[in-house]
Amino acid sequence: MTTYITDKDGKSIDASTVSKIPSDRHFRNAWTLSGTVISEDMATAKTIFKDKIREVRKPLLEAQDVLFMKAMEDGDSTEQSTIASKKKELRDAPATSAITNAKTIAELKAAWDTDLLGASPYA
């Protein structure tokens, strides 16, 4: 039985004939085939990375919304300001320069902000 690998553009190759393949499957949907070499398309990998940030930040933003409402009820404008800043950081997370400037998959993985988003899914 032959196993085929299909890249992001729908090109397929017999897995036994591949000469180089990415070390992990984190960005599997960014794989691109050139001859017998499979590499990762950085533009597609960045999109996947940003989508993962959006997925992770959603519950974090929802939690901040709850805290903000409590601060509003308490009339705590200092806490409201702190929470608003945190929410802005979360909203801006997919647009950081570390992601934009990443030239390699390793640099892209290193762009995960563990202080803001928690443990990296790429560790």
Language model segments and positions:
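A preference for well-ordered globular domain cores
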Residues: 1-123
